[in-house]
Amino acid sequence: MPHCIRGSEGWEIIPQLQEYAAHPIDKPTFGSQYLGSLLRARDEDLRRQGQPGVEKVTFIGVCTDICVISNALLAKAFLPEAEIVVDAACCAGVTPESHRTALRAMKACQIAVEHEGETD
């Protein structure tokens, strides 16, 4: 199912989040190894400067059961000590059941799920 195609309305970031869109990542498919590399590089840069590394990464978006789960798991693999969070109230799956299944799978992989059930 094509979605979030560059230049389409679904690809645009809503005005309320524009200020956080400093470095959007265009990914060729649902999982972004580039995102993992960026997170690891940022973590290493912070540690070289004597600061704590990346401590928390929060994911929102669609589709919970495709893009969100893929990228949350990649982030956990690249930053195993960081807190990886998915805000379930800001996600949607292909179906409500696949959304819930993806949330359960992420929790089983030590990814925190916030606001689960708040929009069901």
Task: Give the positions of each predicted feature.
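Active-site-adjacent betaalpha module
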Residues: 1-120
